[in-house]
Amino acid sequence: MRLIDLERLYDYHYWANRRLLEAVSQLTPEQFTQNVAGSYGSIRSTLVHVLSAEWGWLDRCGGPPRGERLKAEDYPTLDSVIETWNRVERDMRAFLTQLTADDLSREIEFSLGSGPTHSIPMSGLLEHAVIHAVHHRGQVSLLMRMLGFAPGNYDLLVFDSQPRETPAARQ
């Protein structure tokens, strides 16, 4: 994947995150932490999982260290999640601007849980982080619908139809 394509993918990713977090802000604190059907139990837990994973992959690729996996109970409010997510977004965008084509092709080793070690080019790992978030945004959207909210549409086609700054204008 070319760096310009990866930057576009992350532009989409953070656009969709902001829209989702705006939708989640409609929830009461109780709804935000309420256990509902889903792989992580609550909207808060799902968001913290995605945030922890993204920061972890950034760390694995050579960005700022995350340390231990983030825990939902350390994020009592949506604002606390947003604060950390804004920091991770800034760090990821800064990291992406420093990458070269050689960096993107560099093999990164990782394991999933206690399983075997795998190796994948950095570009694939960075793509995975976005695809992983898409999956969980869908879960959060479903959970919000179960709670009676309309979370909106986060499709890439919707993003592409929105006017936005060019990469040069952001610098």
Give the positions of each predicted feature.
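Short, contiguous alpha-helical
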Residues: 7-71, 112-171
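Helix-adjacent hinge/juxtasegments
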Residues: 64-105
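Short acidic-hydrophobic surface loop/beta-edge motif
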Residues: 108-110
